[in-house]
Amino acid sequence: MSMTDPIADMLTRIRNAGMAKHQKVDIPSSNLKVSLANLLRNEGFIKNYKVIADNKQGVLRVYLKYIDEKDHVINEIKRVSKPGGRVYVDSDGIPKVKNGLGVAVLSTSKGIITDKSAREFGIGGELICTVW
């Protein structure tokens, strides 16, 4: 079965694993997903990640982070730009997620970056998702 939106699949797997209180979740790997996992780790939304090689595309193992034993750090993770309706923003149109408490993730000419970095660089891009 072909997957039409692998990024939405990744975000859904992370959301579902967090609600089920899992410590880790395995996701089919790609360069874009690894960049997104790296950004989530740098922003403190996940503990860590690692890429496990197999004979196919590899597996991205994401280790989830919890405030205590039951509360997941990620309250909401939502896909914004979808294959059926891409959402592009310029540097002035980048949204603030929960008045700066959350993070908007953009795909730009400088790679996968946060809304704060995009404002500093003065560039826009495709609004991939929001996390808070």
From Swiss-Prot:
Subunit field text: Part of the 30S ribosomal subunit. Contacts proteins S5 and S12.
HAMAP family, sorted: Ribosomal_uS8_B
Database matches in InterPro entries: Ribosomal_uS8 (IPR000630), Ribosomal_uS8_CS (IPR047863), Ribosomal_uS8_sf (IPR035987)
GO molecular function: rRNA binding; structural constituent of ribosome
Organism placement in taxonomy: Bacteria, Pseudomonadati, Thermodesulfobacteriota, Desulfuromonadia, Geobacterales
Function: One of the primary rRNA binding proteins, it binds directly to 16S rRNA central domain where it helps coordinate assembly of the platform of the 30S subunit.
Native organism: Geotalea daltonii (strain DSM 22248 / JCM 15807 / FRC-32)
UniProt protein name: Small ribosomal subunit protein uS8
Keyword rRNA-binding recorded: yes
Domain of life of the native organism: Bacteria
Keywords: Ribonucleoprotein, Ribosomal protein, RNA-binding, rRNA-binding
Record Pfam families: Ribosomal_S8
